[in-house]
Amino acid sequence: MMKTILGERAEICFAMKANPFLIGPLKDTADKFEVCSPGEFHICETVGIPMERIVLSGVNKEKCDITHAMHTYGNAGVYTIESRKHLELLEMCAKEENITIHALIRVTSGNQFGIDEEEAFNIVSKKNDYPHVRIEGIQCYSGTQKKKFSKIEKELHWLDDILTRLKETCDYDAEVLEYGPGFYIPYFE
């Protein structure tokens, strides 16, 4: 249903933290799986989700976790950039593996997830300092259980503004926008 509404260019990325028990039934439905912990990553490996369909997100990744993914799967998958320090860790690991990885800058909508706009612009303006990390776009998770579409619409305008300013100020064309809108799910109705 979502693909019908959003069109064929849109991909559905299931956030495993929502319910890791759904990964089996969604294996052939979701285009990608957002994985935020080593445990979630292990579940994906066990179930046989190809790395090409995994977005390694969140700050709960240590060097050994990143190195394992890169050493085992090369440059498959997408990594999120949670901070400049995290970007430097991704660059170091990718350089050690002699690969160039795909990454998205995780921008915050004011919650605890991601980096602020100013830092995102600084990272994009210095993207050539990180030759082993190909920044393909931005990611934003803005919360959950939103009942009003007007809030989602406002966030989409805000993200569009960021992408427009990145083009104007940094001559950067984002290829990917990953947006977690936090649709309302009536669990108890």
Q: Could you say what each language-model-derived stretch is?
A:
Residues 1-7:
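An N-cap/entry alpha-helix motif that binds or orients negatively charged groups
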